[in-house]
Amino acid sequence: MHPTVKCFLCVILISFLASCSSVTGSVTTTNAVNSETPEETAMPATSPTPTATPTAEPPTPLPPSPTPSLFDIELPVGEVKYEIPLNIRHVTEDSATLFFELDTPSRGYVSVRSRETGAFPFTIPLDPSQARHLVTAHNLVSGSTYDALVAYEAEEGGYSQPRFLDRTWGPVSFHTRAEGAPLRIGVIGDASFGDKTTTGLVDAMADANLDFIIHAGDVVDRIAANANPFDSYKENFYAPFEPLLTMMPVYTVPGNHDYDRDINYEGEPFYYYAFPPFPDPRFPGQEYAERNQHYAIAYGDAQFVMLDTQVFYGEPGREEQESWLEERLADPGFKVTIPVFHVAPFNSSTVHPDDSRPVRGTWVPKFETANVLLTLSGHFHTYERLMKNAITYVISSGGSSVLYAKGEKAPESKLYKRESHYLLMELDSETMTYTAINLEGDVIDEVTIPLE
């Protein structure tokens, strides 16, 4: 790299730090905390009690010189690689949680810039003792667009961006929600093979001006022989979902294949390593969960309750989840609750149709006595809309080319379409509307649900 460019880049980083209005620490799977001198908290392995870790010493800057913005310079792709590429874990009206992991601990920065004003409300040094970073930028402006960037200090001097599959990743941007604005959500399920059908659906959702994505489970399936889970996720999830992961949060629930033994990492499903808990001010404490097995996200008067149906088939955590679900369903602070989980309580599939029984027997009675009008599920590799006692149960699991045939029609079934598809869901103060759209862009179903 030319010495002048090295100088330019370092000086820009100085200006970033000088302009920060909110600075938080670089951490390992934890929420960063606002302070003048950042104090960091490390995600505990088994305990919900946060543990402080030292603040990273920033790289040594070079003497000042007028420079263009670091965001406007094409940083070279360096030798450090993303094991998990920079993605938007969660966004609220005034904050955003970012997550990534490098293949080696590195000195550098993560920075956020306002696209409207050019201001840098968030710039922190990376902790050079850590490769994994989950950081939250606070004091953002609602209804605004921000760019995010990771730059590390290269051995030969200057700054580089991490590489992803021998290429660049991103650029990464996100939009904070304006208070009271209607929601636009994309829903997809069982998009677990990284095939061309999935990438086509992802591209369509990326062009739909969405706030976030809901993934109804089975994130990655069919792991190649001797492949490690990092490589499998890169090829089957991060690469095909890149147009979405670099623009908005993708909220997931675990499916049965997310527990497959061939994708474990350090004795646990890699799913939980890839999707760590994150902070949400309306659900304090959930960022300290040992597993991100069940959690909630809130947007205005709606809460999305994310659940794990594998507890019905031998996975631990059922009793704890049931207690938490009852608490969420009873919360009077929300006008509507939308449960999201992998195995639907009703189905008309030829493939494992009996899987619905424990879900149906346990959760349907609870939903019917709460403010639930709609649930979102996957598992059966099709589109199906079912209804019972004024609740619409949607199966949206046509996220790939692998589709299941229709079996005996369930009494609750209103429509069954064996088509690859995604859902476009719109939610305002009066109605929920969702549209099922196939790979060709044709509407295969559309439903509007009044919010009572």
List each language-model region with its residue ranges.
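Short acidic, glycine-rich surface-loop motifs adjacent to enzyme active sites
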Residues: 220-223, 332-350
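Conserved, compact domain cores that house catalytic/ligand-binding motifs in diverse enzymes
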Residues: 182-253, 258-259
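Bacterial N-terminal signal peptides that target proteins for export
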Residues: 1-9
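Histidine-centered catalytic micro-motifs
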Residues: 340-346, 375-383
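Acidic, histidine-bearing metal-coordination/catalytic regions of metal-dependent phosphoesterases
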Residues: 22-187, 192, 203-208, 424-452
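C-terminal motif of bacterial Sec signal peptides marking the signal peptidase cleavage site
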Residues: 18-19
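Divalent metal-coordination and catalytic microenvironments
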Residues: 100, 190, 213, 218, ...
